[in-house]
């Protein structure tokens, strides 16, 4: 895959008051081959347009789910979106293979410091453990779950750190080699060109 189209689903119930998610959203708006879709902006007061959402998914290779971590999960609209858009027979079940091979990236802003998300830490579990439902969902619908992007200390992070985070975020979600299979293919091509004689 030399060319990749990315869909960023922004799921923040109050993006204007957000420091991190708002900056991340602004940072990716000007990126080529990236579509930004704010779910609360579109669906705060109206039903989810399932057909539109499914067409958006079909038109992109990588799907980024961007949200603040609330109660060890996503804001409620994302759960509703999954329930309505990942339909039986379309995303999973017999004939439900429309998302097979697409890539899934979870991007989260997290209020507490990273050390609080580990065994023995304040929150007891790592972010990888807490995101198991997303990993399982990606697996069920045939998507490749890629490394997440997380920014900790969302409540105390400085403006400079947020700007740096936005730059790292853009690089992370647009890095085609975030998928280890793509990186492996590049390495194999390089090996083919090496003259071992």
UniProtKB/Swiss-Prot annotation:
Its EC number is 1.6.99.-. It holds the Pfam family Flavodoxin_2. Disulfide bonds: none annotated. The keyword Oxidoreductase applies. It is an enzyme of class 1 (oxidoreductase). Gene3D superfamilies: 3.40.50.360. Keywords: Oxidoreductase. One of its GO terms (molecular function) is FMN binding. Belongs to the NAD(P)H dehydrogenase (quinone) family. This is Uncharacterized NAD(P)H oxidoreductase YdeQ. The lineage of its organism: Bacteria, Bacillati, Bacillota, Bacilli, Bacillales. The gene is ydeQ.
